[in-house]
């Protein structure tokens, strides 16, 4: 192979690796943003529950829409056997 062909092949491989790495970074960043949003909603729920004595239905429904289950999550409760 000519040196120019090797350089082009290396450039193509580097571009493919960069695309894969940045795709993974974007996916992880979205997960972090989603988790922050969930954490903020849970904090608001806790704050409102302390203030009023009950929980806000609107925020619970927002958490349910995102797929977050509310309730007691004990690590020793294993129901997936």
UniProtKB/Swiss-Prot annotation:
It comes from the Viruses. GO terms for molecular function: CD4 receptor binding; monoatomic cation channel activity. It is found in: Host membrane. The keyword Transport applies. Phosphorylated by host CK2. This phosphorylation is necessary for interaction with human BTRC and degradation of CD4. Residues 28-81 are cytoplasmic. Pfam families: Vpu. GO terms for cellular component: host cell membrane; membrane. Its main location: host cell. The chain crosses the membrane at residues 7-27. The modification Phosphoserine is found at residues 52, 56. It is a single-pass type I membrane protein. Changing residue 56 to N: Complete loss of interaction with human BTRC, and of CD4 degradation activity. Keywords: AIDS, Apoptosis, Host membrane, Host-virus interaction, Inhibition of host innate immune response by virus, Inhibition of host tetherin by virus, Ion channel, Ion transport, Membrane, Phosphoprotein, Transmembrane, Transmembrane helix, Transport, Viral immunoevasion. Ion channel activity is inhibited by hexamethylene amiloride in vitro. The N-terminus and transmembrane domains are required for self-oligomerization and proper virion budding, whereas the cytoplasmic domain is required for CD4 degradation. The cytoplasmic domain is composed of 2 amphipathic alpha helix that form a U-shape. Belongs to the HIV-1 VPU protein family. Enhances virion budding by targeting host CD4 and Tetherin/BST2 to proteasome degradation. Degradation of CD4 prevents any unwanted premature interactions between viral Env and its host receptor CD4 in the endoplasmic reticulum. Degradation of antiretroviral protein Tetherin/BST2 is important for virion budding, as BST2 tethers new viral particles to the host cell membrane. Mechanistically, Vpu bridges either CD4 or BST2 to BTRC, a substrate recognition subunit of the Skp1/Cullin/F-box protein E3 ubiquitin ligase, induces their ubiquitination and subsequent proteasomal degradation. Homopentamer. Interacts with host CD4 and BRTC; these interactions induce proteasomal degradation of CD4. Interacts with host BST2; this interaction leads to the degradation of host BST2. Interacts with host FBXW11. Interacts with host AP1M1; this interaction plays a role in the mistrafficking and subsequent degradation of host BST2. Interacts with host RANBP2; this interaction allows Vpu to down-regulate host BLM sumoylation. The infectious clone pNL4-3 is a chimeric provirus that consists of DNA from HIV isolates NY5 (5' half) and BRU (3' half). This is Protein Vpu. The gene is vpu.
